[in-house]
């Protein structure tokens, strides 16, 4: 029984904590977290968030803004703005974008790796 408890403890320690790992950001915090920063994504794409509202990801150029407590972006040829909840990892290295549909994208600051 002790071996089972030890194994369960080791499994739990290797799992990230659910709510404690991420801190939801407010509008001003989103602006501060993204302005003039570059995030890298698992597929190798880099996204640059320019101070003037331009964002560049790979060969694509779009626009970004903060509306309330949401990050919003538009990527031509679409003219539809899509907004996301934003959270920062507890260690401050990663930014998580969560869409209305529950989709999640996580990027890491390239200057903090």
Regions found by a protein language model. Name each.
Residues 1-9:
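Sec-dependent signal peptide recognition
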Residues 2, 16-113:
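Lipid interaction determinants
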